[in-house]
Each structure stands twice: as structure tokens, then as C-alpha cells.
Amino acid sequence: MDLRHLLFTLALVCANDSLSASDDLLQWPQISKCRSPELETFSCYWTDGKVTTSGTIQLLYMKRSDEDWKECPDYITAGENSCYFNTSYTSIWIPYCVKLANKDEVFDEKCFSVDEIVLPDPPVHLNWTLLNTSQTGIHGDIQVRWDPPPTADVQKGWITLEYELQYKEVNETKWKELEPRLSTVVPLYSLKMGRDYEIRVRSRQRTSEKFGEFSEILYVSFTQAGIEFVHCAEEIEFPWFLVVVFGVCGLAVTAILILLSKQPRLKMLIFPPVPVPKIKGIDPDLLKKGKLDEVNSILASHDNYKTQLYNDDLWVEFIELDIDDSDEKNRVSDTDRLLSDDHLKSHSCLGAKDDDSGRASCYEPDIPETDFSASDTCDAISDIDQFKKVTEKEEDLLCLHRKDDVEALQSLANTDTQQPHTSTQSESRESWPPFADSTDSANPSVQTQLSNQNSLTNTDFYAQVSDITPAGSVVLSPGQKSKVGRAQCESCTEQNFTMDNAYFCEADVKKCIAVISQEEDEPRVQEQSCNEDTYFTTESLTTTGINLGASMAETPSMEMPVPDYTSIHIVHSPQGLVLNATALPVPEKEFNMSCGYVSTDQLNKIMP
């Protein structure tokens, strides 16, 4: 509360000080104005204030070119408390300074130039004239005239004046102004008939911003002019406001209707739908419900979505077709007899027909009755079982061996069976080379037989397609011969055993007897001799005889030729084939058995 009282007291003190200062100013005499009506003479006016002895106040003036203050030349012409300067005391381009003073002090002082204080007198002789009325008789146009101030020498061009006209209805308080103009004739348009107007005019120097005093008011009344006016209702004004309001409402309603009618389309344009995954031929509901089995069955029924059937094994390759090679078409190879008409009739592994090209194709869906499942499913069958199945059905499934080769091998097996005694004698003559570090030259037919025994484990199961016959058969190039089997056979015959030791391991004797049984038809030139002091145990006599008989019995069955080709699994591309993968046989593990020892005498008795 104390703070509020303090602030209020300070405000009152400040207000009193300002009022006292203004009162002090009003108490002193001041120059109110100086004006020149025509730019030839000028007058200055002042106020006395509270000074009673007016006779003591004087107006002093001085031109800047002079240095002395002079008293006013005329105190009477311009009126009370004024000083008039006629043309003899007026210099337009020379500044003046005036001041109010008495004998002891100066009350007020001003400096100016004559052209700065020009305030023309008001125009005179205002008048108006009716120009025309509207067809309805509601509005009328008039023209207002006046004369320049008589004190201003406008005709000679000593001063140029601009005029401002203001008008209003009689009952109104605000004046309407027109733009200043140089002409003394101004038209007024669209004045309402039956209304009275007031008009006034004032002027100013063209280069000045201060207007002079207004002229006398001119009253305009259409009834006084003798114009017959039909009293009617108020002028019907065009309802612009209502038009704007209703127009905006109509546009809003139209926009709402358009939005409602085009709502789905606009919704798609503003918020486009998220595309759902679509597969041709598959119902999207299956994907939503998670029925993957049905989706997989549908995909499997279409060729476009069918998965590739080649295996992931590294030894399954793609074979390119070289159809345009004319040299391969004219070349006669061993596979021409292999894929002859008789052979194709008996074996139908390559007899499927391709509807697109007319050539033979082993595409899997077209051969439902073949036994490829026994050799193609490498993932479901072990390597050993698959090898057994291939060896049992290799002639029916692979279809790649010549009949004459089989007959030749069978005749060779029969010859071996009918002449055991001869084989025994040859073995007795050739049983010592493994112990004498000597090499023999093998018979080509027997070497081929031995190589065929091991060719299944070292055969490349791929073949180059050389031609497709008009009948639809696929002609394959000759496969690579088994080199590893031949090397093993030669290494077996070339094994050397030293005679430094008087004992021989029973396992070594069995190996030698097995080798001799396989090479019973090979001629031997070198002769062997053994030490008389050597001997071997008799516990292996029965085993050796049994092994010898078993090896002789198994030799014809193992002499079956192994094919160097394989069947076509699927046509992968217009120039590529996928062959069936044939599992390589897994070699049986050899276990070191404890063996007895035999002497050289017992060995001579066993060896024929």
C-alpha cells in the first residue's frame, strides 16, 4: 500500500509541474503565427498573456543581412496584437527574425522565410450547377465553381494555388474530401436527390503543405433548384454482402458434394493402398492362412514355378548340346550301336518324346514308370546301398554296353571254368614273381578284364552328347576308360617281396594267391626259386584253399563290363542336359588281422 501511495504522489507532482509549466507559458506573451496571403506582404500575430501593460510589448524584426533590430512598421493594418509588413518591408528570398520583448526582457522569438509562411485567403464566390440526373431520379450530378482569393495574384502567375473541396450531407458530421487540384471547377457525382449537402473549399501554395482557411459553406438543395423530385423509397442498393455470403456457402456445399461422391477415388489418390503379394494362379487367401502345402502343390503343377531338379553335389554337371556340329553327325562312334533301334526297344530309358522339339528327352515328368528313383535319390539312400542297386540293374538302367562285349566276356568266363587244371599249372609257374622283384607283360585281354573289375569305382559318370537322331535318341560320345583300375592291377602284379626273411605273413600269401588266380591266363617267362630253409605254418592251408576257390568263383561275376555313360535326368536349358548321378562305391575297409607264418616248404606245397 505504501508503494502505491508513493507512486500516486509522484504522478500528481509531475502533473502539477507540467500544468504549472504550461500555465507559466500561457502567462508570457507568445508569437502565434506569421502568414503571407499572396507572397508579397506578410503579417505576424501574438498574444499578451497576463501582462496588463500592453503598450510596453514591442515586435522587433531583423533581416539576416542587417545586424540591428528594428521595430514593427505597422501595428494597425493587420489588427490588434499584429504587425503588418507591406511590400517595401518584404523581401521574399531573405530570411526574417522577429521577437516579442519589452525594455527589460524578451518573451518570444522566431525566424522564417516569406515563402514558408504563405497561407492564401479562402476562395470566394462559390456556386454549383446541376449537370444531370439518373433515369430513376434518385441520383444527380452537379458542378461546383469558385474564384481564387482576391489577394493572390494568380492570373499573373506570381503564385500558384491548389484547391481542396470537401462536402457532406447536412445531418452528417464527417466531411468527404476530394484530391487537391489546380482547377476552380470540380464536378460531384451521384449525389442523392432529396438530400441537402454542404460544400466548402480551401487553398494552399503548390509548394507548401499548409492549407489556408476554408471558404464560406455552400448549401446544395435540389428542391430549391426547382427540380421535381418524386419521393420514393430508399434507393435499392445491390446486396453485395448477401451475394458474397451465399456464394461462399454455395461453393462449400458443392465441394462437400464432390468429396462425398468421389470419396473412394480421392481416398485412393490421397492414401494409395499398399500392394499385396500376388502370384498368378494362387489364391492370396492361401498365403494369408499359411497353407504352404497347397501353395507348393500349385507351384509344382506349373512349369514356370517348378523348382530346379538338379542335385547339389559338385560332380553333377550341365552338358551343352552342340546340335549344329555337322562333323559329329557324320562321325560313327561306339554309341551308334549302343543306341540302335533294337537296343532302344528293349530299354526305354531315352525313349521319351518332347512335344516342343520332336527330339528325345528324358525329362522326368514324361517318364513316370522308369526306375530312376533307385539311382537318383542320393539323399535318401546310402552310398553302399546305392552301389549295390546300380550293380544289380546297371544293364537295364544305364543301357550303355554293347551286347557283343557281354558275350565276349561270358565266353572268356566259360573258358576259365572249363580249364581249371591249366590255370593251376600256369599259377604254379607264375606264383613266384611277387617274391623275386620281377615284372611281367600281361595279356591285353586279361588286363581289360581286370580293369573292368575296378572300373565301376573310377568311371567318370558323364558323357558328351554328340548328336540327337531323328528318331529321338540321344547319341553320346565314348566315355573315358578306367585308368585307376588298370593302375591298381599293374601295381598289384608288380609288388615285390624280398626273400630276406624266412617267414611269410599269411595275408601276403593270400594276396599273392588272389593275384595269381586273376592272372591265370597270362604267360610267364621268368622262373622263381625259394630258399630251402624257409617254412610257413599249416593253419592257413585251409584258408588259402578256400580263398583260392572263392576268388575263382567270383571272377566271372566281377568281369561284367561297367558302363562309361549315364542316363539323362532333365533338360535344363535348350542346350544343356542334367545326367543322373550314380554314387561311387565305397571301398570296404581293410582290417589288419593277426596272421601266422608259413615256411617255404609249405608254401611250395600250397602253390600249384
Swiss-Prot record:
It is found in: Cell membrane. The keyword Protein biosynthesis does not apply. InterPro entries: FN3_dom, FN3_sf, GHBP, Growth/epo_recpt_lig-bind, Ig-like_fold, Long_hematopoietin_rcpt_CS. GO terms for biological process: cytokine-mediated signaling pathway; endocytosis; growth hormone receptor signaling pathway; positive regulation of cell population proliferation; positive regulation of receptor signaling pathway via JAK-STAT. Residues 267-352 are annotated as: Required for JAK2 binding. The chain crosses the membrane at residues 238-261. Glycans are attached at N86, N127, N132, N171. Receptor for pituitary gland growth hormone (GH1) involved in regulating postnatal body growth. On ligand binding, couples to the JAK2/STAT5 pathway. Belongs to the type I cytokine receptor family. Type 1 subfamily. This is Growth hormone receptor. The gene is GHR.
